[in-house]
Amino acid sequence: MSWKVEQTRRFVRVYKKLTQISLIADTDAAVETVAENPDVGERKKGDLGQLWVYKFRSQGQLYLLGSTREDTVRLIYLEALGPHENFYRDLKR
């Protein structure tokens, strides 16, 4: 059974700016993968301990999809999306 997926404002802002159709399709596929199995990806440590990051490739570049989850209500919050460069620094802000 799939989990319910919610988007944060940060994620929506980045998603709206995507212009390449293949990147949008790859992002949608990554979101579906996370919704079907939230344990995919890796859990971060330290300051970002509640964050799960799923890595995927699009057009030869590595992208990261950051999410948090509520296990009791089976809800996933999409927190951030972007290339690896400065991804974690921007999330800490």
Residue ranges and their predicted role:
Residues 1-30:
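Arg/Lys-rich, positively charged N-terminal/basic patches that mediate binding to nucleic acids
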Residues 1-6, 41-46, 53, 77-78:
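Alpha-helical interaction segments
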Residues 32-58:
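A short, surface-exposed loop/turn module that caps and links secondary-structure elements
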